[in-house]
Regions:
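Short alpha-helix carrying the canonical HExxH Zn2+-binding catalytic motif
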Residues: 35-48
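Metalloprotease/metallohydrolase-associated module, dominated by Zn2+-dependent proteases
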Residues: 1-37, 53-123
Length: 123
């Protein structure tokens, strides 16, 4: 906090280190940059948690997991391109495809159409 104002933030490890430590789900990419894919997937996970648990003590399940942790490294329904890269999200208004891990939604009306899980790719 700064004075009496709470300042939300997220912390993520050294970005060049993400893909060298196995944080990329695949070493080929649907958009030509698997390093960017690793960063994007992890950032989506952390941003989702910063929105739903900004004080780091708001919501945990019985195992101590935040919402995105419940679906970590689960990617759901995907499409495989001719180069072997999988993708499950296309950025709005672009042709750019990404392979993004899913996040858990408490709304039981929203589920992955294939698995029926509350883990979905956040749009």
């Amino acid at each position: 906090s700064v004075g009496n104002v709470s300042v939300p933030y997220i912390a993520i490890q050294d970005i060049p280190d993400l893909y060298s430590r196995g944080c990329a789900a695949q070493t080929i990419s649907p958009n030509g940059d698997y390093k960017l894919d690793a960063v994007a997937s992890i950032l989506v996970h952390e941003i989702d948690e910063s929105l739903t648990d900004p004080d780091l003590a708001t919501w945990f399940d019985a195992r101590g997991a935040e919402n995105a942790d419940k679906c970590a490294w689960a990617f759901g329904t995907s499409t495989t391109l001719s180069n072997g890269a999988k993708w499950n999200y296309q950025a709005p208004g672009t042709l750019t495809k990404y392979y993004i891990q899913m996040n858990w939604l408490a709304d039981n009306k929203v589920t992955d159409p294939v698995t029926g899980s509350a883990c979905v790719v956040t749009k």
